[in-house]
Amino acid sequence: QKEMPRDTNYVQYKYYTAIFAVQSEYHKEAVQLLEELKDGDYEAIAVNQFLYQEYVELKDTVKFVETLQNAIKRFPKESWFLQNLINYYIFSGQEQTAIDYLAQAIEREPNVAQYHHIRGNLNENQGNYEEALADFDAALAIDPKLSDAMAGKGRVYYNQAVKLNEEAALISDNKAYKKALAEMNEVFRKSLPFFEKAHEMAPEERSYIQTLKGLYYRYKDELDMQAK
């Protein structure tokens, strides 16, 4: 059997020493070893994944973001790094940056419905309503049973109507107030069929039921469902 080069043996030894440090929760020691290995070819993806996780354990945000960004460039077909970076930006309130990275994710994997759905939620939060509707439509085109995307379309209109209601409350002129209320009711009505379809897709989802109850009550319609 052909003997492996000494350098390969050394790299393997360092890698397994790093794994031992990770498992033993010697985070600083693990980081030092993984940093020395991260640009090499031996188990390169795993090394960078472990390095990110160790920086998370050390609560070093700058370094774990940097690790993810570098790994995304080096391993463009490995979605794990991109997904973790997107999650970080979402949960840290950097929604526009998350939207930008989701565009990359969609370009790489256009047939993942959840990418479109998540971007739709973020666009809706940012007030990008047309973009949000397009994202939800794209998600449903890939997965017609994705009830959350259907409800997302309803929510786009529902939340706009809530905002119009808040604005109408500040109007003192009676004629203008009635006009604002009419506009608000029209937008609320637009949300109704999407929540009805979402309820048909997922009849046990209570958030859809509660929203529909409120909409039916608003328009004095009968609640044609079994609420549990």
Describe these PLM feature segments:
Residues 3, 36-37, 70-71, 104-105, ...:
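Canonical positions in the second alpha-helix
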Residues 3-6, 39-40, 74-75, 108, ...:
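Structural marker of alpha-solenoid helical repeat scaffolds
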Residues 159-197:
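Short coil/linker segments at helix-helix boundaries
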